[in-house]
């Protein structure tokens, strides 16, 4: 047996309420539909009446309208005076009409939804911006500018121009609020100190960079001076080699020991063997004398090296029988061993060599012209 409760349950009561609301809405909709249908029929009748009227020209219509206005049946239409300018946005017009409502909420896709309470909290959290004077002038500079009585101290050139006017009202306001909000003043002081520390660090870094650049420039100058000195030394060595009698080869740039030997190199124009023997025989026994007339030079070989050194010391740069002589020890010393007597075959080689004697021992054969003539006659 099913037991049905006498009253309705909560769900049934809620459904009944909804049903009643729907009925009321349906009745309202029907009433609105009736009103709209009646308005459309009236508009259609007006349109029909207007369409049934005869078509008139603009000139006749304007004359009829003027007569009606004069009679007072129709009032003249007043032209609206519109202010020419830029169009205002609808949101701005809404703000101007209802300033108490505040800004109309609009959908902004790239902005998080912020309520008015959150906006107020954020504005309270944000640090207040400093004035332009505070951002450039620190508190210590302001105290220096002020005198002991709180007045501006007179400095050099204070009376030359008009007095400077600073925003002291802001100072008074900040002093009044400082007692009420000490944490703000502390945060400002901390920010000032941080800014000063940053400026000091930047200045130190700049000074270090300048010192480094100066040291680099000094090192570069030193290197340049060293290179210049080296180049000068090289040039001096080259000049010395060029000025000397024989140029030193590039493969042996180091200093050489003085030459030693018994063979001399003699340079002079129009030299003769008799002149050379007469000039060089007083210093020692000459074992070889060879000449090279195309080059204006000769080679004189002594028996001893001491005599060669003495001849160089006394005859180099002198003039003998109007011939300027340049005497030096020869680079090549082929007769040194033979002259000193170290080898047995050396003396023989010197005696029989083509350079050993300046005169050829062979006899020259000379043919007369008569012999040629006789041979020609016999042939024909």
Swiss-Prot record:
<feature type="repeat" description="8">
    <location>
        <begin position="198"/>
        <end position="199"/>
    </location>
</feature>
<feature type="repeat" description="7">
    <location>
        <begin position="196"/>
        <end position="197"/>
    </location>
</feature>
<feature type="repeat" description="21">
    <location>
        <begin position="224"/>
        <end position="225"/>
    </location>
</feature>
<dbReference type="InterPro" id="IPR000504">
    <property type="entry name" value="RRM_dom"/>
</dbReference>
<dbReference type="GO" id="GO:0032021">
    <property type="term" value="C:NELF complex"/>
</dbReference>
<feature type="repeat" description="11">
    <location>
        <begin position="204"/>
        <end position="205"/>
    </location>
</feature>
<feature type="repeat" description="15">
    <location>
        <begin position="212"/>
        <end position="213"/>
    </location>
</feature>
<feature type="region of interest" description="30 X 2 AA approximate tandem repeats of R-[DSNE]">
    <location>
        <begin position="184"/>
        <end position="243"/>
    </location>
</feature>
<feature type="repeat" description="18">
    <location>
        <begin position="218"/>
        <end position="219"/>
    </location>
</feature>
<dbReference type="GO" id="GO:0070374">
    <property type="term" value="P:positive regulation of ERK1 and ERK2 cascade"/>
</dbReference>
<feature type="repeat" description="1">
    <location>
        <begin position="184"/>
        <end position="185"/>
    </location>
</feature>
<keyword id="KW-0677">Repeat</keyword>
<keyword id="KW-0013">ADP-ribosylation</keyword>
<dbReference type="InterPro" id="IPR035979">
    <property type="entry name" value="RBD_domain_sf"/>
</dbReference>
<dbReference type="GO" id="GO:0034244">
    <property type="term" value="P:negative regulation of transcription elongation by RNA polymerase II"/>
</dbReference>
<feature type="modified residue" description="Phosphoserine">
    <location>
        <position position="113"/>
    </location>
</feature>
<feature type="repeat" description="26">
    <location>
        <begin position="234"/>
        <end position="235"/>
    </location>
</feature>
<feature type="repeat" description="13">
    <location>
        <begin position="208"/>
        <end position="209"/>
    </location>
</feature>
<feature type="modified residue" description="Phosphoserine; by CDK9">
    <location>
        <position position="185"/>
    </location>
</feature>
<feature type="region of interest" description="Disordered">
    <location>
        <begin position="30"/>
        <end position="67"/>
    </location>
</feature>
<dbReference type="InterPro" id="IPR034637">
    <property type="entry name" value="NELFE_RRM"/>
</dbReference>
<feature type="modified residue" description="Phosphoserine">
    <location>
        <position position="131"/>
    </location>
</feature>
<feature type="repeat" description="10">
    <location>
        <begin position="202"/>
        <end position="203"/>
    </location>
</feature>
<feature type="repeat" description="6">
    <location>
        <begin position="194"/>
        <end position="195"/>
    </location>
</feature>
<keyword id="KW-0175">Coiled coil</keyword>
<comment type="function">
    <text>Essential component of the NELF complex, a complex that negatively regulates the elongation of transcription by RNA polymerase II. The NELF complex, which acts via an association with the DSIF complex and causes transcriptional pausing, is counteracted by the P-TEFb kinase complex. Provides the strongest RNA binding activity of the NELF complex and may initially recruit the NELF complex to RNA.</text>
</comment>
<dbReference type="GO" id="GO:0003723">
    <property type="term" value="F:RNA binding"/>
</dbReference>
<feature type="repeat" description="22">
    <location>
        <begin position="226"/>
        <end position="227"/>
    </location>
</feature>
<protein>
    <recommendedName>
        <fullName>Negative elongation factor E</fullName>
    </recommendedName>
</protein>
<feature type="repeat" description="27">
    <location>
        <begin position="236"/>
        <end position="237"/>
    </location>
</feature>
<feature type="modified residue" description="Phosphoserine">
    <location>
        <position position="353"/>
    </location>
</feature>
<feature type="repeat" description="28">
    <location>
        <begin position="238"/>
        <end position="239"/>
    </location>
</feature>
<feature type="repeat" description="20">
    <location>
        <begin position="222"/>
        <end position="223"/>
    </location>
</feature>
<dbReference type="GO" id="GO:0045944">
    <property type="term" value="P:positive regulation of transcription by RNA polymerase II"/>
</dbReference>
<feature type="compositionally biased region" description="Basic and acidic residues">
    <location>
        <begin position="186"/>
        <end position="256"/>
    </location>
</feature>
<feature type="region of interest" description="Disordered">
    <location>
        <begin position="79"/>
        <end position="258"/>
    </location>
</feature>
<feature type="repeat" description="23">
    <location>
        <begin position="228"/>
        <end position="229"/>
    </location>
</feature>
<feature type="modified residue" description="Phosphothreonine">
    <location>
        <position position="272"/>
    </location>
</feature>
<feature type="repeat" description="30">
    <location>
        <begin position="242"/>
        <end position="243"/>
    </location>
</feature>
<keyword id="KW-0539">Nucleus</keyword>
<feature type="repeat" description="16">
    <location>
        <begin position="214"/>
        <end position="215"/>
    </location>
</feature>
<keyword id="KW-0158">Chromosome</keyword>
């Amino acid at each position: 047996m099913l037991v049905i409760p006498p009253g309705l349950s909560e769900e049934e009561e809620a459904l009944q309420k909804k049903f009643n609301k729907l009925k009321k809405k349906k009745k309202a909709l029907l009433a609105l539909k009736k009103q709209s249908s009646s308005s459309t029929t009236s508009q259609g009748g007006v349109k029909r009446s207007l369409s049934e009227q005869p078509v008139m020209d603009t000139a006749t219509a304007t004359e009829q309208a003027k007569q009606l206005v004069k009679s007072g049946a129709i009032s003249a239409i007043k032209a609206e005076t519109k202010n020419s300018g830029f169009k205002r946005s609808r949101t701005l017009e809404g703000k101007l009409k209802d300033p108490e409502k505040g800004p109309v909420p609009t959908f902004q896709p790239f902005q998080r939804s912020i309520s008015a309470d959150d906006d107020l909290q954020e504005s309270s959290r944000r640090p207040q911006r400093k004035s332009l004077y505070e951002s450039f002038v620190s508190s210590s500079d302001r105290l220096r500018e002020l005198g002991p009585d709180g007045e501006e101290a007179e400095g050099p050139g204070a009376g030359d121009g008009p007095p400077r006017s600073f925003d002291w009202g802001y100072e008074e306001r900040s002093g009044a609020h400082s007692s009420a909000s000490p944490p703000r003043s502390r945060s400002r002081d901390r920010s000032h100190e941080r800014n000063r520390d940053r400026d000091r660090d930047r200045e130190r870094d700049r000074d270090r960079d300048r010192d480094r650049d100066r040291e680099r420039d000094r090192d570069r100058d030193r290197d340049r001076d060293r290179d210049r000195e080296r180049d000068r030394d090289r040039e001096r060595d080259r000049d010395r080699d060029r000025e000397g009698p024989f140029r030193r080869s590039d493969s042996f740039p180091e200093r050489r020991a003085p030459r030693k030997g018994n063979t001399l190199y003699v340079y002079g124009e129009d030299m003769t063997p008799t002149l050379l023997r007469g000039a060089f025989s007083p210093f020692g026994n000459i074992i070889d004398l060879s000449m090279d007339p195309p080059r204006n030079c000769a080679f004189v070989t002594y028996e001893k090296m001491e005599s060669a050194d003495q001849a160089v010391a006394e005859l180099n740069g002198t003039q003998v029988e109007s011939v300027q002589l340049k005497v030096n020890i020869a680079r090549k010393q082929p007769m040194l061993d033979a002259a000193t007597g170290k080898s047995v075959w050396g003396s023989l080689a010197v005696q029989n060599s083509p350079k050993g004697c300046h005169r050829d021992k062979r006899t020259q054969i000379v043919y007369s012209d008569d012999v040629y003539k006789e041979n020609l006659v016999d042939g024909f």
